[in-house]
Structure formats: structure tokens, C-alpha cells
């Protein structure tokens, strides 16, 4: 109509403008636009709904269990006489674990901002580059063969064996990933983002560069994918893991105290268990830049990998004093979300990987 009033010819079916208009109104384009809008909305809201996702440390049962275990650990510390008996119990707990000094620290504020932005950008930028253990198992099946699905259902013992071995492979994969981030100089530049935290809260767990997150996803996908293919190939193609509310049953148990790894609640499992399991105290010491702690305790659930690799530092029962951060004088370089994303690339640009040192290298600290 407007074209006619202006004396312009209407676009013909051969006109690119006409074709683009038709394409834009087609069902296929409508579906694509709907998916894009839906994904953008979902990724924007997902960080706010993490307390409903069982695969997040912010899942509400894990938050409740964290608070409960923190209170029990605090009571045990008081019973040992390590705290000030003159203070009321509730005030001591609040001052130690819930104070503004901790949760409103500049480093904590940066954790909060980085969490929301990273949760939106990571699936869009790095997500297409990721692969799953199921994808690895399928690829191995295409290469080496995959049996037809058996009519007989897998037994409970088969499922239990798969659940346990999958967990071991997953934990080993995460240890290998974490060690690569510490030992390979150019990867350490990206892992510095996580270690630049000056205080620890459960949100610090999400303070990780997308490159860091990709490495932490790739290796466990390989180790668990191999295990999955082996069970499909040699046990039962219909086998599945034992889960609880949609999450691997063993990981569920460990996640009950998982948030304490990044919180100033000292929970050590004792001299015997500490040699087999990674306690929250193990990982808190991992964030220390004291010379005796550098590069220690890289595992997540099992301490056996650190023992074999020579990086296990067994935490004492009483809280140990240490300083956190990078300790290399670069604190001012990790103050904004932009710096957390860009600074690792700038460091690699300014200093070739061969000249970049990891925390275990002489002269880095």
C-alpha cells in the first residue's frame, strides 16, 4: 500500500526482498525464531533457577545440607575449644561464616556477577564444542561395534558395578583435567581466574573461565565414555546407572557437603579418611598460596589420585591458617568480569606459553 502511494512497484516473486519476506513468514523460520528466543530466555533465567536443578551445587537440598553440616562442623569446633566461648553460639556462627565481611567482599561480588554472565555465555560460546560420555560411547560403538539391545534387563549388580566404575572414571577424569590446568603453563593462565578469588563462598565454585570449564568437561567425558561403551559392549546394552532424583547416586552423597569446599567452614575427615577421600578442608588448602600448599589436593572426591601423583596434603583436624589468592602481585588484574574473561588471553599474548610459569614452577610465587 505504501509503495503504491509512493508510486513504487510492488516486489515481484523474483525480487530478493519478496523471497526474504516469504521466508521470514514461513513455518520453518517461525520455528527457528521461536527456538532462538526460547533458548535466549532460558539461558537468561537458568542461573536464577539453579536451586531447582539437581546438577547444580545450588540445588536446594544441597544448600540445606550445606547449612546443616556447617552448623555441625561449627559445633564440633566449639566443643574442641577452638572458638571464643564468651561469644553467644549464634553470633559466633554468624561472624565466622555469614558475615558481610565474607559475603559482601569485593571478590564475592565479582563471583556473583561472573556467575550470571558466564551461565548465559558459556552454553552459547563453548557449548557447541562440548561432547558427552554418551557421545564418546556412541563413537566407540561405531568404530568397534555395539551389540543389539538385549531382551533381558540388566541385573541390580550390573547396574551397581556400572554406577561405581562410572564414578571412579568420572573422578579420575576430573583429577586429570585439574592437573592439566595446573601443570600446563598456558592452561594455568585460564585456571588463574578461579584461584584469583580472595575469599571463598559456594559461588566461588562457578568462578571459572570458559576455557577452564571446557577442559574440565572434555576429559571426564572421555573417561566415562570409555566405561559406558565397555558396559554396553560386554555387559548389557540397556544398562543404566543407579540415580537418586535424577543424579548419580554416589555423586549425590558427595554433593551434600560439596558447597563446603568453597566456604570457610573447616571440615576435615580425620587422619584415616583424609588419605582416601577429599574433604572440604583439602580443597580450601588447594586455594592457598602458601609454599607448602602450592598445587596440592587436586582431586574432587577421591584422594587416591593425589596420593599416586604426589600432590596430597592431608589437612589437620584443627583449622590451618593460610592465605588465599594468587600471591603473585596480580590481584589488581582480576577485579572485573571483563578482566576475568580477557586477561588470560592478554597474558598469553604478552608472554609465550613457554615463558609462562605454573604455581609449581620456581619463581612464580
Language-model segments: residues:
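Short, strongly hydrophobic alpha-helical membrane anchors
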Residues: 16-52
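Short, low-complexity, charge-dense intrinsically disordered segments
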Residues: 2-13, 23-24
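Membrane-interacting alpha-helical segments
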Residues: 34-49, 113, 117, 257, ...
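A membrane-cytosol interface segment of integral membrane proteins
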Residues: 319-365
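Membrane-interface segments at the starts/ends of alpha-helical transmembrane spans
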Residues: 37-57, 105-108, 149-157
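Membrane-embedded catalytic scaffold of the fatty acid hydroxylase/desaturase
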Residues: 117-129, 141, 148-322
Amino acid at each position: 500500500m505504501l509503495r503504491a502511494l509512493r508510486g513504487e512497484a510492488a516486489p515481484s516473486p523474483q525480487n530478493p526482498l519478496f523471497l526474504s519476506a516469504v521466508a521470514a513468514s514461513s513455518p520453518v523460520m517461525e520455528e527457528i525464531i521461536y527456538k532462538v528466543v526460547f533458548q535466549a530466555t532460558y539461558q537468561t533465567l537458568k542461573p536464577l533457577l539453579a536451586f531447582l536443578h539437581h546438577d547444580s551445587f545450588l540445588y536446594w537440598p544441597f544448600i540445606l545440607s550445606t547449612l546443616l553440616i556447617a552448623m555441625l562442623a561449627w559445633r564440633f569446633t566449639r566443643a574442641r575449644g577452638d572458638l571464643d566461648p564468651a561469644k553467644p553460639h549464634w553470633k559466633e556462627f554468624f561472624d565466622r561464616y555469614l558475615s558481610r565481611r565474607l559475603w559482601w567482599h569485593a571478590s564475592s561480588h565479582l563471583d556473583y556477577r561472573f556467575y550470571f554472565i558466564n551461565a548465559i555465555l558459556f552454553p552459547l560460546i563453548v557449548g557447541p564444542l562440548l561432547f558427552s560420555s554418551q557421545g564418546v560411547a556412541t563413537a566407540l560403538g561405531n568404530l568397534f561395534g555395539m551389540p543389539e539391545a538385549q531382551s533381558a534387563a540388566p541385573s541390580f549388580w550390573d547396574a551397581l558395578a556400572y554406577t561405581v566404575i562410572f564414578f571412579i572414571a568420572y573422578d579420575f577424569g576430573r583429577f586429570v583435567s585439574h592437573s592439566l590446568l595446573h601443570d600446563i603453563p598456558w592452561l594455568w593462565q585460564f585456571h588463574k581466574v578461579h584461584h584469583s578469588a580472595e575469599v571463598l563462598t559456594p559461588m566461588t565454585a562457578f568462578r571459572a573461565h570458559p576455557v577452564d570449564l571446557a577442559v574440565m568437561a572434555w576429559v571426564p567425558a572421555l573417561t566415562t565414555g570409555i566405561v559406558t561403551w565397555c558396559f554396553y559392549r560386554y555387559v548389557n546394552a540397556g544398562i543404566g546407572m543407579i540415580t537418586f532424583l535424577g543424579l548419580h547416586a554416589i555423586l549425590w552423597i558427595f554433593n551434600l557437603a560439596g558447597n563446603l569446599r568453597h566456604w570457610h567452614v573447616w571440615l576435615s575427615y580425620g587422619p584415616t579418611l583424609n588419605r582416601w577421600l577429599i574433604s572440604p578442608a583439602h580443597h580450601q588448602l588447594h586455594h592457598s598460596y602458601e609454599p607448602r600448599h602450592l598445587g596440592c589436593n587436586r582431586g574432587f572426591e577421591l584422594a587416591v589420585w593425589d596420593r599416586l601423583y604426589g600432590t596430597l596434603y592431608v589437612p589437620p583436624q584443627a583449622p590451618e591458617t593460610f592465605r588465599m589468592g594468587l600471591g603473585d602481585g596480580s590481584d589488581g588484574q582480576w577485579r572485573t568480569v571483563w578482566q576475568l574473561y580477557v586477561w588470560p588471553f592478554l597474558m598469553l599474548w604478552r608472554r609465550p606459553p613457554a615463558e609462562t610459569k605454573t604455581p609449581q614452577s620456581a619463581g612464580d610465587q
